[in-house]
Amino acid sequence: NKAFGDTANHSQSNTNPGYANFDWVTNENATDNTIKLKEAYWLYTKERLFGADIPWAASVGRRPSTDGLPINIRNDQQPNSPLSHTVDVEFDGFSVRLDTENLTGFTGSWFKICGGRGLTNAKPRFDMSGAAYAEDDDKNVDIDMLGFIAVPYDNGQYSVHMNYARAWNLVGFDGQSLNSFNTAYGAYSAAPSSSTEYDLQKATPEFKDVGDIDFATVLFKTEGIGNGISNYLDNSIAFASFAASKTKPNDKGMLGSTDSETGTSVWLGVNAPCPILPDSAKIGLEWNKGSKYWRSMTYGEDTYAGSKIATRGQAWEVYRTQKLTDALSFGLSYVYMKYDYTGSNSFFGADGTP
């Protein structure tokens, strides 16, 4: 039994330990010795929709919303949804998928609507502050997301994937609070005392609602490079993905700006059989580049140094993965990120200023 997403009364600043204990990434970060639940959802499938030859499925719960295409290629696993170029976080919500090939005539086409709640504003029970689960006007409002995933074509070798989503009431630190905290932190660092420590505690910023954001992704993937050129190329995978983000700030500003800012990112990758035995091993090379105001929601990406896909600058990765059993794999990876701007892995307020 849990709230959808994080809760509005969850130590709002998340300054210790950073964002690591936020609900979107609670299973991607080692925070304490408790066991977390990553996925638990209800799934219903049926072959016909109101008598029409349209297979469909619906699900509700803590859905598999991390490790989507194409990050799953590096991880050597089946893709979840949505596309991981823009969204790779744990999320509580719903989805409805329609297989549209029989309707449109486009090979392998399907369409999915996804929605969820990333933060729930509700007073807890038995806290003596008012009606249980009532809205708390002193806390952040609900964070919601709604979007779609569409595959207009997939013949098993070549496929096109598209993703659009909007998220409302995203959180971050406002500029004034962040500046006050930085000033207090500087004073404490220069002259530690009970007085400067108290001032630092008072200046600890809290997350505020800073605005909305739009995400869009278009991805092309080929499983097999060419046709019959060689067995090696037939067993290789290549992809190219383009994504964009567009902020819609309120008066507190997003990413350090009160204007709507657009960011873009390109992501290219290739995955091929490792020429060194065993046959189950794969090697890969990936490169991505993000612009000044690029902002992805990829906090759940499994890397040591934050999300490489969020990089405002360029990132390279070389990796090798090997299946040990059907359920266990072993991987080695080298990631290099060259930042052109600050704020790549922050949330959506002044802490994300480039």
Language-model region placement:
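Outer-membrane beta-barrel transmembrane strands
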Residues: 30-37, 41-46, 56-61, 105, ...
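Outer membrane beta-barrel
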Residues: 1-129, 143-162, 265-299
